[in-house]
Amino acid sequence: MADLAKLVDDLSSLTVLEAADLAKMLEEKWGVSAAAAVAVAAGPAAGGAAAAVEEQTEFTVVLASAGDKKIEVIKEVRAITGLGLKEAKDLVEGAPKPVKEGVAKDEAEKLKAQLEKAGAKIELK
């Protein structure tokens, strides 16, 4: 812990030019670019309309309703999420509820088709 405190003190005493040189050295050593991260972070703030046009990359698969085949839907929810029988049943009966969050578009479409085949009504958000 004392080493970290010393490191913080050393970094705090750097001039702006020394800090910029340090950033460049770390970028080279780690093979990353801090400039790209800054550009990405600044992008949405600059143009809200451009962000709206961008295609969504992460989706939440939401179970809107179980439909008539509730048992089949519970089985599919268990297979997808790894939940136990009671937890999957509670999720299905408590619809609308998210089944899986932060999934890629192709996986979300696959899960939607799988659950709809079992009889569920699914929304992608």
From Swiss-Prot:
Record's subunit section: Homodimer. Part of the ribosomal stalk of the 50S ribosomal subunit. Forms a multimeric L10(L12)X complex, where L10 forms an elongated spine to which 2 to 4 L12 dimers bind in a sequential fashion. Binds GTP-bound translation factors.
Lineage top rank: taxon: Bacteria
GO cellular component: cytosolic large ribosomal subunit
The keyword Ribonucleoprotein appears for this protein: yes
Protein name, per record: Large ribosomal subunit protein bL12
Gene3D superfamilies registered for this protein in UniProt: 3.30.1390.10, Single helix bin
Keywords attached to this entry: Ribonucleoprotein, Ribosomal protein
Stored InterPro entries: Ribosomal_bL12 (IPR000206), Ribosomal_bL12_C (IPR013823), Ribosomal_bL12_C/ClpS-like (IPR014719), Ribosomal_bL12_oligo (IPR008932), Ribosomal_bL12_oligo_N_sf (IPR036235)
Function: Forms part of the ribosomal stalk which helps the ribosome interact with GTP-bound translation factors. Is thus essential for accurate translation.
Protein's gene: rplL
TM segment ranges: none
GO biological-process terms attached to the record: translation
The organism of origin for this protein: Methylobacterium radiotolerans (strain ATCC 27329 / DSM 1819 / JCM 2831 / NBRC 15690 / NCIMB 10815 / 0-1)
Family: Belongs to the bacterial ribosomal protein bL12 family.
Cross-referenced HAMAP family: Ribosomal_bL12
GO molecular function term, any single one: structural constituent of ribosome
